[in-house]
Amino acid sequence: MEAFGGFFVDEKAARVENIFLEFLRRFKEADAAEAFYETELEAMRSRESTTMYVDFAHVMRFNDVLQKAISEEYLRFEPYLRNACKRFVMEQRTGENRAPIISDDSPNKDINIAFYNIPMLKRLRELGTAEIGKLTAVMGVVTRTSEVRPELLQGTFKCLDCGNVVKNVEQQFKYTEPIICVNATCQNRSKWALLRQESKFTDWQRVRMQETSKEIPAGSLPRSLDVILRHEIVEKARAGDTVIFTGTVVAVPDVMALTSPGERAECRREAPQRKNGSGVQEGVKGLKSLGVRDLSYRLAFVANSVQVADGRREVDIRDRDIDGDDSERQKFTEEEEDEVVRMRNVPDFFNKIVDSICPTVFGHQEIKRAILLMLLGGVHKITHEGINLRGDINVCIVGDPSCAKSQFLKYTAGIVPRSVYTSGKSSSAAGLTATVAKEPETGEFCIEAGALMLADNGICCIDEFDKMDIKDQVAIHEAMEQQTISITKAGIQATLNARTSILAAANPTGGRYDKSKPLKYNVALPPAILSRFDLVYIMIDEPDENTDYHIAHHIVRVHQKREEALAPAFSTAELKRYIAFAKSLKPQLSSEAKKVLVESYVTLRRGDSTPGTRVAYRMTVRQLEALIRLSEAIARSHLERVVLPAHVRMAVKLLKTSIISVESSEVDLSDFQDADDGTNVPADNDAGQPTEMDAAPQQDGPENEQAADTGKKKLVITEEHFQRVTQALVMRLRQHEESVTKDGDGLAGMKQGDLIIWYVEQQNAQGAYSSTAEVKEEVKCIKAIIERLIQRDGHLIVIDEGAAPAADDGAARRTSESRILAVNPNYVID
């Protein structure tokens, strides 16, 4: 047998080859009629592959001695195992009208072998010199991949002295020439020429693997290892994948240690041949003698199979395969489809699925619903011009400290295998997108993936999003909308895919969220970033006795009983299968849903332009696209193939509760209300037939101690009502001031009574009141608002207190109504 450039017979290896060939011929499953690996040959023909995948559990069941020999000395027996596979293929290719795997035109074509399902999965830290040459499986996260290059496997060399040709010189992980010419009269040892046409090359790729976060001991940095991929398994592992590599550990020369400047450069001064001759210095001549001169080696892993740890179906939550082609639907077994249909038929299934999201966190149903829709996502579309329309949903959570924001991010990063969790404060622009690094061996520049690239077809969770620097926030603008990353550095110009959903968490600027201010004043995020989020949720930590009791009871129960305290309707595995099945659906918009979408968008735009209303950010076309994505995600959650109007209405409700609910904060005016009931309003102000009052004062809240002591009821109105009345009064006072300035006659301010009468008449003309009682309550609120604007906010000032009447019982009332009010010159309308 020919091996390693010489002729010798390895009897043990030959026996292993024969036993393995017998295994391929005879092994059958329990109820199978034909041999298992004859069926594997059919699969190889169908995919035009030259790699035979062997389940190592089958080898263990067939012959224990064979599995022990392969496990202990895999590197020694690997050429013989490949030869056994080739013999098996050659035997099976005759006698049938099938396309042969090895044709007559290429009889020297090799069959590669790939083992999987190794019982003992090693950790990356456990790989040492004791594992060299053994068959091992190791799991890690791919962080960098090189380009695919040709590698010389077996070289054919020509002797430059005598012209003799030496074939099949196997390369020992470095450029290996024949030791000596086979011609007995030549004795050449160094002068060789490589015949590339007769040599054997294969595809080669180097992958950088890093141990998973769960395997890193406390206080340690993550270890990394280079993995060598050959043949058909190149490009099977992408950056960000959690992968199981099966292969063996080898020792390879450390190029970096040999080429470090000033450390191991060897020089030799030859003796001068003549008296006046000068010495000649000779340094390192290249990499031909690599590993010979220096005992500098490092460990690497040569893989023969690549297997995604959690299954490609769960990794690719975007329902796109490795090549990004989403035309093929995933295949599901009948049992899986029956289970999904059973979950769909459970009463109130949608709320139960929402409750199954992050069960350790109590409440926050809206945020859990948003995370579910983000996991489902919308339908990815491509226009005729080739423009990609984003189907991924971005969610931002803004809230006070200790509101479980990070818990939601950790849960989402854990349920989706292809996900990245990072912190905005410690992440740079290059760390989030991509950076250009230099290859240590070749010196060429390559692209190293950042967090968004590692989360391609997954979810990127960014905590402390508001703590990022401005220059780093700008870097993710393109990734959030176009879902690409453009790089022009070091002579490399590339556009990379970053098809990821972003789940971000941010804290308010003042430590606590101020409900009296819009979102843009509470979060240090520019409008360009905020508009790219489909949903923005506010989490406010307000004391509430009932809610606090349930939260405390839930947390104590989780600490006491651990998993027993959590009883979600569906387990995490069931939830993953349901999401995977729902993502295989591509719902289409119906004509009725289209009409509802257009009407809803017009209504939202109208509300954005109405004076006195304050939304989190401007309504743009991005919000219309967000409505479409949310509607498609809701249709997927119901396993519908058509988007119905009910789905659109639910999406509109979600959008409103996420970005407009911030306005519904309350303003307490109990300290500013007057003792009277406002009965001095002219009688003609309660006429007309108006409809329902827009924002009535809330009288059913808990009593305020100070108000109770003085015999007053608590007066609470909505923030929207407060802002609307404030802006109307200020605008009226400004108009009056401008008219007085223009005419040059009269007082610059208005009487408080005249101002109140003007506002009530304006509202009455619009049909805002249905009874005299509502008018009285409105006047009471306006008086309290004016008092707050004067005493606390300082937006209004009193020019003249007015003349006090002689009657004692009406003095205070008429004095309050007769005082002259004006706008503070320093106040600017927002």
Swiss-Prot record:
Function: Probable component of the MCM2-7 complex (MCM complex) that may function as a DNA helicase and which is essential to undergo a single round of replication initiation and elongation per cell cycle in eukaryotic cells.
Keyword Nucleotide-binding: yes
Domain of life of the native organism: Eukaryota
Binding site for ATP: 399-406
Record keywords, A-Z: ATP-binding, Cell cycle, DNA replication, DNA-binding, Helicase, Hydrolase, Metal-binding, Nucleotide-binding, Nucleus, Zinc, Zinc-finger
Organism per entry: Oryza sativa subsp. japonica
Region spans: Disordered: 671-710
Reaction(s) this enzyme catalyzes, per UniProt: ATP + H2O = ADP + phosphate + H(+)
Protein name: DNA replication licensing factor MCM6
UniProt record similarity statement: Belongs to the MCM family.
Keyword Nucleotide-binding: yes
Molecular function, one GO term: ATP binding
SMART domains: MCM
CDD domains for this protein: MCM6 (cd17757)
Main location (coarse class): nucleus
Disulfide linkage: none
GO BP terms in the entry: DNA replication; DNA replication initiation; double-strand break repair via break-induced replication; mitotic DNA replication
Zinc finger regions, C4-type: 159-186
